[in-house]
């Protein structure tokens, strides 16, 4: 498709959102409403024009796309007026695709069909059949041909019984659009310039008005308040989950799975309830995620078990590793093959070598740990001196006893052993036992104090 201009109407304030942000910057699945629409026109349209109004500077800063032509609508005088603001930027020999910034679930395939229809007829609109059409403009037909669109407030009782409604989304040959916009007026209940009035102009002019009917009523659903926003979030998430399952992902309950980003996965992966995927996440084959896990911007390999209640962010986990339960893997961590990060372990900006175990109740920060290392319960890498972070290096085969503190910067040698309860402040040599303890004293005649 060539010479297609998208006009996205995004000037509304969205008062019912009760928010300091304009409506089009409300988020659905970690993307703005406007961002969702922009993703659908990408690759479909040659130029994108966004008509902005309320908090326009905020909208432009958030979207931050130099390829967009931003057009200001200084007065909110209706959809027809909004589209007219963009027309000086659009060539006559093009197709204008008109979209709305608060209708985020529209599909690229639907828009492609609509554009194709308009290329044939000159003007094509998107309609939908609704059980409850309240609030929408009714499509008036005669002998199956569209004759007019009548807004809810201007409709007769007979017209209000019509279930086919206008979505407001249309594709029009730009020369025709300019011609018809010059003919509409504000003689209606709202005193506004309705974009839909161009349909009556086209009919009067003998112009064929073609249409396609959306197969999915949710893709044309608009958002006016936080309740509707939450409803669309659930629709968006269940649609994603359904698509993932069709591609082979096993979800224990698709209603309790959320993906807010880009998710790719291998074969035979299983995800239990209350999982949240954020950012860009990759799973290999045969990876299992237990309930209540959050995974963000991470690459996770094959045959990995992520047990319940783990938080994993910006890290790489190699094949065969086990994580959790109740583990937190913080950014810039690399966990190598068959390593184990157990319950109540926090790892930050560290490399955990292959076959290394950090099984419970430990903090590992700014560390490089070799292979076949055992980190016992309660081990802390003391990486922060109050100003700077320092590194801990632990060689292959080392054994760190329970309740030990490794005060960085420090190096623990290969096959070194750190005795339980030690505070280590100096390098521990290879193949030696290092420990720091006060001598144990037992007081033979000591008695516990009694209550007075």
From Swiss-Prot:
Binding site for acetyl-CoA: 377, 383-384, 402, 420, 437
Keyword line: Acyltransferase, Cell shape, Cell wall biogenesis/degradation, Cytoplasm, Magnesium, Metal-binding, Multifunctional enzyme, Nucleotidyltransferase, Peptidoglycan synthesis, Repeat, Transferase
Pathway(s) this gene product operates in, as recorded in its UniProt entry: Nucleotide-sugar biosynthesis; UDP-N-acetyl-alpha-D-glucosamine biosynthesis; N-acetyl-alpha-D-glucosamine 1-phosphate from alpha-D-glucosamine 6-phosphate (route II): step 2/2; Nucleotide-sugar biosynthesis; UDP-N-acetyl-alpha-D-glucosamine biosynthesis; UDP-N-acetyl-alpha-D-glucosamine from N-acetyl-alpha-D-glucosamine 1-phosphate: step 1/1; Bacterial outer membrane biogenesis; LPS lipid A biosynthesis
Record-listed E.C. numbers: 2.7.7.23, 2.3.1.157
Ranges where the record places region Pyrophosphorylase: 1-226
Residue numbers spanned by region N-acetyltransferase: 248-452
Residue sites binding UDP-N-acetyl-alpha-D-glucosamine per the record: 9-12, 23, 73, 78-79, 100-102, 137, 151, 166, 224, 330, 348, 363, 374
Region (Linker): 227-247
A GO term, aspect molecular function: glucosamine-1-phosphate N-acetyltransferase activity
GO term, biological process aspect, one: UDP-N-acetylglucosamine biosynthetic process
Cofactor: Mg(2+)
Domain of life where this protein originates: Bacteria
List of catalytic residues: 360
GO cellular component, one term: membrane
EC top class named in words: transferase
Database matches in HAMAP family: GlmU
Family of this protein: In the N-terminal section; belongs to the N-acetylglucosamine-1-phosphate uridyltransferase family.
Role summary: Catalyzes the last two sequential reactions in the de novo biosynthetic pathway for UDP-N-acetylglucosamine (UDP-GlcNAc). The C-terminal domain catalyzes the transfer of acetyl group from acetyl coenzyme A to glucosamine-1-phosphate (GlcN-1-P) to produce N-acetylglucosamine-1-phosphate (GlcNAc-1-P), which is converted into UDP-GlcNAc by the transfer of uridine 5-monophosphate (from uridine 5-triphosphate), a reaction catalyzed by the N-terminal domain.
Protein name per the record: Bifunctional protein GlmU
Organism: Ruthia magnifica subsp. Calyptogena magnifica
Gene this protein is translated from: glmU
């Amino acid at each position: 498709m060539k010479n297609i201009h998208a006009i996205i109407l995004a000037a509304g304030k969205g008062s019912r959102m009760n928010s300091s942000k304009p409506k089009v910057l409300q988020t659905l699945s970690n993307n703005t409403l406007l961002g969702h629409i922009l993703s659908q026109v990408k690759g479909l349209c040659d130029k994108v024009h966004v008509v902005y109004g309320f908090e326009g500077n905020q909208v432009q800063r958030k979207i931050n796309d130099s390829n967009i032509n931003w057009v200001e609508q200084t007065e909110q005088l209706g959809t027809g007026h909004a589209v007219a603001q963009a027309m000086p930027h659009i060539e006559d020999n093009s197709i204008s695709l008109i979209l709305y910034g608060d209708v985020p679930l529209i599909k690229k395939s639907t828009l492609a069909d609509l554009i194709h229809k308009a290329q044939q007829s000159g003007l094509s609109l998107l309609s939908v059949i609704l059980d409850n059409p309240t609030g929408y403009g009714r499509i008036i037909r005669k002998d199956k041909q569209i004759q007019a669109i009548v807004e809810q407030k201007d409709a007769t009782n007979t017209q209000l019984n019509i279930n086919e409604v206008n979505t407001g989304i249309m594709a029009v040959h730009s020369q025709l659009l300019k011609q018809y916009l010059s003919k509409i007026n504000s003689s209606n209940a709202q005193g506004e310039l309705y974009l839909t009035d161009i349909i009556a102009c086209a009919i009067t002019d003998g112009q064929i008005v073609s249409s396609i009917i959306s197969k999915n009523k949710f893709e044309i659903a608009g958002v006016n308040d936080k309740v509707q926003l939450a409803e669309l979030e659930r629709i968006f998430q269940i649609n994603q989950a359904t698509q993932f399952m069709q591609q082979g992902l096993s979800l224990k309950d698709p209603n309790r799975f959320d993906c807010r980003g880009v998710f790719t996965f291998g074969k035979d992966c299983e995800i239990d309830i209350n999982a949240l995927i954020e950012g860009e996440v990759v799973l290999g084959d045969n990876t299992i995620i237990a309930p209540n896990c959050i995974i963000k911007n991470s690459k996770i390999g094959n045959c990995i078990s992520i047990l319940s209640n783990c938080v994993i962010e910006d890290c790489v986990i190699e094949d065969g590793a086990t994580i959790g339960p109740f583990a937190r893997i913080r950014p810039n961590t690399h966990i190598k093959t068959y390593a184990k990060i157990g319950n109540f372990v926090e790892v930050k900006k560290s490399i955990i070598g292959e076959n290394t175990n950090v099984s419970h109740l430990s903090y590992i920060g700014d560390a490089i740990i070799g292979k076949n290392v055992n980190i016992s319960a309660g081990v802390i890498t003391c990486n922060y001196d109050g100003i700077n972070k320092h590194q801990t290096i632990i060689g292959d085969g080392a054994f760190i006893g329970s309740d030990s503190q490794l005060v960085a910067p420090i190096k623990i040698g290969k096959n070194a052993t750190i005795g339980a309860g030690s505070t280590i402040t100096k390098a521990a040599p290879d193949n030696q036992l290092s420990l720091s303890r006060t001598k144990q004293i037992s007081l033979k005649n000591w008695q516990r104090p009694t209550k007075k």
